[in-house]
Amino acid sequence: MTVRQRRFAMVILVVIGVSIATGLGLKAFQENILFFYNPTQIMAGEVPTDTSIRVGGVVVNGSVKRESGNLDVQFDLTDMAQTVTVVYSGLLPDLFREGQGIVAMGKLGPNKVFEASEVLAKHDEEYMPPEVADSLAKTKANTEDKL
């Protein structure tokens, strides 16, 4: 093998190695990304049912139902236009309460019931997760346009 052929083979091997590393990195990133949806998008059927997603909105007043004897809880989440039911088994954050903005992570189950694996509550009275605030603002604007 001449020097030129060895150099060409080395360049090809480096390109193949970088391509494989890039492909594996993109695949890992794609599997770990969680898309954000609001209740209107969920009820419209715009949400994949086979992957984990995040849903955000405001907990509907009077909708929180806890089962006695275990940690199961069910509540409704709204973006002021549509409402989706969320079921969760576990300890809710201390700041979780009705009328407050939350983000839940999980999968969409049968009958458009969201099965949460994690629930995140807002931090103080002024804070609302940016995705939830944007979603509520868009929904409010769309609702006002229709009136």
Curated annotation (Swiss-Prot):
Membrane-spanning segments: 8-28
| Family matches, as InterPro entries | CcmE (IPR004329), CcmE-like_sf (IPR036127), NA-bd_OB-fold (IPR012340)
Q: What coarse category fits the chief subcellular location reported for this protein?
A: membrane
User: Which sites bind heme?
Assistant: 123, 127
**Top-level taxon of the source organism:** Bacteria
Q: Which residues lie on this side of the membrane: Cytoplasmic?
A: 1-7
Does Transmembrane helix appear among the keywords?
yes
Q: Where in the cell is it found?
A: Cell inner membrane
Keywords associated with the record: Cell inner membrane, Cell membrane, Cytochrome c-type biogenesis, Heme, Iron, Membrane, Metal-binding, Signal-anchor, Transmembrane, Transmembrane helix
Describe the function of this protein. Heme chaperone required for the biogenesis of c-type cytochromes. Transiently binds heme delivered by CcmC and transfers the heme to apo-cytochromes in a process facilitated by CcmF and CcmH.
Which family is it part of? Belongs to the CcmE/CycJ family.
Instruction: Supply the name of the protein.
Output: Cytochrome c-type biogenesis protein CcmE
